Amino acid sequence: MAWKDEIQHVVVLMLENQSFDRLLGFVRLDDASQRIDGVTGNETTPAALEDPARVVRLERGTAPALYITDPTPGHQFEDIAVQVFGQPRVPDPPTPTMNGFVDNYARQAGPDGKPIGSERAAAGLACLDPALVPVITMLAKSFVVCDRWFSSCPGPTWPNRFFVHAATSNGYIDSPTDMQALAGFLTTRFRMRTIYENLAAAGRTWAVYFGDHAQAFGIGTLHRYARDNFRRLDAFAAEVAAGTLPHYSFLEPGYMDAPGSPAADQHPPHHLLDGERLIAWVYDTLRGNEAVWRKSLLVLLYDEHGGFFDHVPPPATVPPDPASATAEKFKFDRLGVRVPALLISPWVRKGRVDHRVYDHTSLLATVKGLFGLPDFLTRRDAQANALDDANFLAAPRALVDTPANLTALVPSHAPAPRAKKLSDLQQSLMVLSAALGAIGGGGAPGAGAAGNRAEPQSP
């Protein structure tokens, strides 16, 4: 296929904690034959699992208040088990019911310390009207939507981001506590072979670009690449403009609020439009150099669903390795909840829906084939579907056939209220930052980010 000969740059932007149905469930494409498996606004779910006859409707969300979700829906393993299976563990046999989202969220504590209840939970889990998220909607209509892309495990950020780099989390399914984050960073627990070693072995270039913290640097095998391969997000723009973009680029958003630079990861309670602006910035930057754009594939992904409703049951899969197959809580034999995923390039078809099953390791399988890498990393990426050739064209689309200046689509908005405390993810990243500072003398990526709540960050 021509695209495999022509694509020289794969760029991955992975944001945080949104389900497919929440961001893309109501999107309708111009070609009626291309139907996204989304929602209608008539979906109902039990208000409480102990009383399944009492249901609530998950309606189309049109209120700007939905840009900020507070409290954050549960998205640890036990929460996801309730959401998917209706109980805080995976049953035997594992039959997903997808009926525990409202029940689980209703138990989260509000500002008064009391559970928010099913009515508020149902309202907070509404799937969004496409007009609320104009950037991702425009990209979905203009490029390829993957409506069977699942997170790699039913867990939170850390294990799923490990999967996108290493095709395994070494049996790790939770958000790390402070001591676990530190211990994992300092010991062999987080030392997995990654796609980056394989890229280097094949003579391919790569970089991780980050806003304030490089969560990827929690993987011990990447520490030796700190000086040459980890860069701030503004370096991405400079390298695109100069035509020096590496073969593989992984972009991490800013996870923390700072004056003049709000968190752009879309992790609740951060403002969704700040993430929309980052998506637009990455796209506009890449498209701004036509020579680079014509040789690029941008993959927009989310690490996990963040506790938000999705109606498609996650399928079974294979454990990546023995450490995962024998893990105590979960055997890593089922994917996590579906997440938004878009393929963006002049080489992809306009307004197409890809219904193949993918997870984050599909990205690794695709990169292996595209760049001639030596080996698969684990059993998981070895059996994962690579991107379907049917998504791609025999020749690239003209620049005028792709949308321009997506940044202009993002409405102005007041900043999100500052959270009273750090999320589990932010806390673990702060611990990682402290460890980096102690070990790397401030020279490691993210080592200087401990003060990121007081100083502006890139981009």
Task: Please describe what each predicted stretch is.
Residues 1-459:
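N-terminal pro-sequences and low-complexity stem/linker regions of secreted or lumenal proteins
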